[in-house]
Amino acid sequence: IQVQNVYDLVLKNELQTLREYKDGASIRTASKMVENDFKLNGYDLVHSLGHGVGLDIHEMPFINGKNDNTLKANMVVTNEPGIYIPGNFGVRIEDTVLITKSGCINLTKSDKNYIIVDNGTWFI
C-alpha cells in the first residue's frame, strides 16, 4: 500500500504542475508547490522538479525553489517530481513539455496508470 500511496502523491503533483506550466509561470512557485505538498505528507523533493531540454538533455532553466525566473513560451522543459524511500523504493513520473502562452503541450505519450505485475511493481 505504501508504494501505491507514494505513487498517487507523485502523480497528483505531476498533474498539478502540468496545469501550472505556461508562459510567465513562476519556476519557484511551481517547485515550492510540490515541495510543500510532499512535506505535508512526510516526504522531501530531493532533486529539482525539472530542467530545460535543448542542445543538452539537462540545461537551464533548472526548475527548483531557488530559481526566480519564469517559464517562457517555446521552452522545452521536464516535469519530474519524485519521492525516494532509501533502501526500499522510489517513484518518479517524468514528462517533457513544450511551454505555450496558455499552458503546455505534453510531448511524452506514456500512460500513467499504476500496474502491479507478478509480485513486482511497475510504474508505467
How would you describe each model-predicted region?
Residues I1-I124:
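Active-site neighborhoods and metal-handling regions in enzymes and metal-associated proteins
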